[in-house]
Amino acid sequence: MPELAEVRLTGDFINQSVTEEMSFIGTWKNPVHKLADLDLTNVLLPDEEFKIRAESRGKELKLSITPQESHPFSVMFTLGMGGHFSFGEVQERPKHTHFSFLTVDGERELQFVDIRRFGRWKIGDWNPDRSPDLTIEFEAWSRNIMENIHHKDLAKPFYEFLMNQKWINGYGNYLRAELCERLDINPFWAAKDVVRYDFERFCEIAARLPIEAYFLGGGQIYSWNNPLGVTRDSVVQEWNQWMKAYKNPGFENLIDNGGRRFWYHPKWK
């Protein structure tokens, strides 16, 4: 599942593919997808052109829509298990495209491709139930953790707490495993005990890891949907060296309450 780095790279790809001079004039939805189409009749005039820019916050991706005359609005995307964007010709639309924004010339489109169909889209804004982005809103994020240290969620095991987007928006399986390994602390302790053990170190490493993953190309474990196509051998080697715990054959693993696999050092068994 795409995590913070992969979602941010997706936003980068959209902004590189869709120039500020490019205009769009409608959308297309694959009828096989059960999610409802976007009803733009209340936010756009008939045949009104609009611009698109992307930004990310944790695991959320926002496409800001700026119409020629109507008020700006946003379309929120979650990428699901492996959704990604491409930009290409309408006539060469990828098989698993489920939603697209059509350019004015009618020949090209910004395509949301999602083989497993877990991705979602809707008109809206950032989800208030998700935490600040720890890489760009560090102070707000760390303050939120400390001010809520006695919340019932922090009484749960640390490895479960890390997957709760209410507290760490952007973390998923590989970031969880890597953070636990680098902290070198028992991941089965209550989250509040791990966090309070060395709060500054916890915050620093938790915020640094997704930034490192981003600069390594968003994780070669997702090379099949990396929109920027980072495939250089040197980057792959750097990524493999960076990854210490996730899918490490020498580590223990278990299935958590959410059905996700967690890798951890054998000494914590």
Question: What would you call each of these model-derived segments?
Answer:
Residues 1-130, 262:
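Acidic, proline/glycine-enriched N-terminal capping motif
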Residues 24-28, 189-201, 222-226:
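Short alpha-helical "patches" and their helix-cap loops
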Residues 54, 167-168, 254:
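Residue-level marker of motif borders
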Residues 70-185, 190-193, 197, 202-203, ...:
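Phosphate/anion-contacting hairpin/loop surfaces
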Residues 15, 19, 180, 184-185, ...:
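Hydrophobic/aromatic-lined pockets within catalytic cores
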Residues 49-50, 161-163, 249:
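Short hydrophobic "helix-edge" motifs at membrane interfaces and signal-peptide entry regions
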Residues 210-269:
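C-terminal accessory segment of soluble enzyme catalytic cores
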Residues 198-215:
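Basic, amphipathic alpha-helical segments enriched in Lys/Arg and hydrophobic/aromatic residues
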